[in-house]
Amino acid sequence: MRYDDFRRSDDIEDRRDDGGGFGGGGGGFGIPMGGGGLGIGTIIVLGLLGYAFGIDPRILIGGAEILTGGGQAPTYQTDRRSGPTKTGAPTDEMGSMIAGILGEIDDRWSEIFQANGQSYTGPKIVLFRNATNGGRCGMAQSAMGPFYCPPDKTIFLDTSFFREVETRFRGCSGDACKFTAAYIIAHEAGHHIQNLLGIIPRVTRLQQQAGSKAEANALQVKVELQADCLSGVWVNREEKKRPGFLEAGDIDAALTTASAIGDDTLQRQATGRVVPDSFTHGSAAQRKQWFMTGYREGTVQACNTFGGGA
């Protein structure tokens, strides 16, 4: 992926130097993704509950558990972080790339919204290491993977997740991993689009009315597959705006990553069996299918997972 000419967004809060937690006495919170502690092995297990990446899992999963008496509603908090925070486009290589990806995502979606007579305000991205305050979505932890917090319109992202995708998920290799990062961020931005369009609130209400956890999970799968499709829409529009930004192997890397974090793949790796009723993000085949649908068609209308047999 060529991104040198991407517009860098300033809607980034860089907490990577915060010390990995809330501060206070002792060493604070530390949840390393590699080595000891919680890593991708934990994510694979948590993936059974939808913790690969997507909407803040405490919102949708918590909602599903409430239906069956298995959990409590998520607690939203005011943001009480400590430690240094930087705002604006980061200058390090990883941070600058993320700022560029967000800038281009915002520009393309702004064009789409304007063409339909609507205004667009982009999401904010919070970069962190290990753990941080997730605002009204509670604690953000590395083991949860990247997620979007609807009430704050914010994407939370520990950039070490991208290394894990390459080294443990084997979702990409070499320069193609840059585009995998773009796919992941575009997926999270897809949830922001759903939020702006009122899809997330409507699905939340439907989940509350669902008669079973399996039914609630099925709704969540449609949300996640639609976000995959919307990420493909962005790639389509970006390619038209900046021909040549994609390089050989980029699309294949995104598809490999989508397959690697499919619910069936994660469940098979974690337990050796697949339970479709417990899916929360969709199968490997579904995730690839809907990303490619968005990429080929380039329209929001093509991403109707709720009526498209997802």
Regions found by a protein language model. Name each.
Residues 48, 109, 157, 183-196, ...:
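Active-site recognition of the HExxH zinc-binding catalytic motif
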Residues 195-220, 224:
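Post-HEXXH active-site segment of zinc metalloproteases
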Residues 259-310:
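Pan-zinc metallopeptidase signature
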Residues 88-103, 172-184, 214-225, 245-249, ...:
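Soluble non-cytosolic domains of exported or imported proteins
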Residues 74-182, 194-197:
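Peri-catalytic and regulatory segments of divalent metal-dependent proteins
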Residues 96-120, 217-266:
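Short helix/loop segments within enzyme catalytic domains
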Residues 1-86:
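Long amphipathic alpha-helical segments used for membrane anchoring, targeting, substrate engagement
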Residues 132-138, 192, 260-269:
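Secretory-pathway/luminal and periplasmic proteins that interact with or process carbohydrate-rich
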